[in-house]
A protein has these predicted regions:
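Short beta-edge/loop segments at beta->alpha junctions of small alpha/beta modules
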Residues: 1-78
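Structural motif detector for alpha-helix initiation sites
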Residues: 20, 83, 151-152
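Hydrophobic/aromatic-lined pockets within catalytic cores
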Residues: 28, 91, 160-164
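Short, structured interface segments that constitute the first stable element of a domain
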Residues: 29, 123-142
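A general structural signal for short secondary-structure junctions and capping/turn motifs
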Residues: 39, 111-113, 145-148
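Short gly/ser-rich loop at a beta-strand->alpha-helix junction or flexible surface loop bordering the NTP-binding
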Residues: 44, 49-58, 66-132
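Hydrophobic alpha-helical interaction segments
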Residues: 134-230
Length: 230
């Protein structure tokens, strides 16, 4: 085993994203010595650079493989996973998603192809600052923490990004391929949490239309159940 990897594992940091400062505390010694150890570990593939000053051990030295959602929040601090990526995470859309899409608190879009961890996209939206994390939940997957939008928040972020106007529930079911069995799971408090989050009227109008459509779906299901039981 690579010496640096062995030291990191024995320190209990094998499954974490490590900064230069943390590596310095683990390795000790002079700056030149630490630089040499890190350089050799990078060249051997035992250590992988996430971005400048941030590293992870290669999967062979970790308990769990690196999760791209956790890395996304290291690549752009303050971001959260959303849109199609979050919808796929929750099982709301059938398609596989090969880009980790996140919403960023910054003003500029950013895309990057990481040689080890895949493709990432960071998208800014016109949001009121106080509602930036409304409907965003902390998940822990394979001992790695990540912020992921709820299904409703992920859908609404996508709507806001595309500037999609409300055209009826058929757009959600046909264009996004979201089944009504998922839609009726959305609770009233989920809609309430997102009111006032989006700056554009089209997004707010979509949220209002979707909330009414979901209420109608639930009412229809109740009526069918009552009819079947009578």
């Amino acid at each position: 085993m690579n010496k640096l990897a062995s030291l990191i594992k024995s320190s209990g940091y094998a499954d974490r994203v490590l900064t230069d400062q943390q590596l310095g505390r683990i390795l000790g010694g002079s700056d030149d010595r630490r630089y040499g150890q890190v350089k050799r570990a990078l060249q051997s593939g035992a250590l992988l650079r996430v971005k400048r000053g941030h590293y992870v051990l290669a999967d062979e030295f970790r308990k769990n493989p690196v999760h791209p959602y956790a890395l996304a929040q290291v690549l752009v601090v303050g971001s959260y996973v959303s849109m199609e990526t979050a919808l796929a995470f929750h099982g709301w859309i059938p398609e596989a998603v090969f880009t980790t899409v996140s919403v960023t608190p910054g003003r500029k879009s950013k895309e990057m192809d990481h040689p080890d961890f895949g493709r990432f996209a960071f998208i800014p939206l016109a949001l009121h600052r106080s509602g930036f994390l409304a409907g965003v939940q902390r998940h822990v997957v394979s001992d790695q923490a990540m912020l992921v939008a709820s299904p409703l928040r992920a859908l609404m972020d996508l709507v806001a990004y595309r500037k999609q106007k409300w055209e009826g529930i058929a757009w959600v079911q046909n264009n996004m391929r979201i089944d009504q069995t998922h839609l009726v799971q959305i609770q009233a408090k989920g809609f309430s949490a997102l009111r006032g989050v989006y700056m554009h009227k089209s997004a707010s109008g979509f949220l209002y239309g979707l909330e009414k459509a979901v209420r109608d779906l639930k009412a229809s299901q109740r009526a069918l159940r009552n009819e079947a039981s009578s």
